[in-house]
From Swiss-Prot:
Residues 77-135, 386-408 are annotated as: Disordered. This is Protein DDI1 homolog 1. Residues 96-109 have a biased composition (Polar residues). The keyword Hydrolase applies. CDD domains: RP_DDI (cd05479), Ubl_Ddi1_like (cd01796). GO terms for molecular function: aspartic-type endopeptidase activity. Belongs to the DDI1 family.
Amino acid sequence: MLITVYCVRRDLTEVTFSLQVNPDFELSNFRVLCELESGVPAEEAQIVYMEQLLTDDHCSLGSYGLKDGDMVVLLQKDNVGPRPPGRAPNHPRTDFTGSGSAVPGTSSSRHPHPHQHHHHQHQRIPSTQQAHGLASGENMAFAQDLNSPALIRSMLLSNPHDLSLLKERNPALAEALLSGNLETFSQVLVEQQRERAMREQEMFRLYSADPFDQETQARIEEEIRQQNIEENMNIAMEEAPESFGQVAMLYINCKVNGHPLKAFVDSGAQMTIMSQACAERCNIMRLVDRRWAGVAKGVGTQRIMGRVHLAQIQIEGDFLQCSFSILEEQPMDILLGLDMLRRHQCSIDLKKNVLVIGTTGSQTHFLPEGELPLCAKLLSGAVQEDSSDKEVAGSIKHPVKGPGRKKH
């Protein structure tokens, strides 16, 4: 038979779920099943049916008159003693995302019991008036304590899962939390709660305004659009979390004039470039033709000092002809652009994680993150460093030569 359980926890949060059990199922076992769903310890659970408290744990549910489709109420007892080891109070439902959406629950995955089948589960936060007379003075004080910044901070620091979610979805609050300053954390938390309250008030005003007013309709449309964006992001976090990670750029080992280098493979760049510092280390600055000087413009600008028309680059055991445009300032030593990749019919095989040299048939593996140059590693400042790399790559996509210089 299917029994619906309406649970009211000690902190006044509610949860409703359904259990598939047999009529001869004992009340003690039923409490355990409810604990798996609600998180309320079995010894603290009070089961009420038809305004009657069920007390005999050895009686079956059928003996109490329960039948298919009935509903029971589960009340959590007041805290009468120390909580068993390993149990923690339910976390407060605070806006930890900074955008009005709550972090998903942190309870562990539930395993189906042989006598139960989960049909649905829904959680919400009741107001004091919605507690159906179950809010005692202690419950109210406990609920207020759950909104304490100090308690929230200690809960987050003691729960690695919640902390990782906070870092991912609300970096500002996570930074304040990890600063170790309770006052800073409280200020950020209170400010975000205030902003959320203001958004809720604004939404109330929008939905209570004249529905035929054009300005109101435009604001409601924008709010719906933002909600769709937020929902799309939350779905992406659940279904494709890898899309929020940073991807290591494609680098290979090579040699120029006998000097080992790490080359950035960029099929989106028009030409192969080398930094001035790298050219000096490789002793090819003497070959730079300064008649090809100019400015590379794209996302940013870079000064082109000149061009080395012909040099050799060694990839694995192959020696390949290559030309380099020398840039005055850039973080990368060398960037292999489309001119070199096309000339040697190179192909990027991401499945095998190799660069295939079409003219020779040889291949070389892309470097793992640990072997990348410092400017390409995914560190705390990786976003800024990656932007610098992108700026250089974007600059050379549309090079602008100096006056009277022939394009190549």
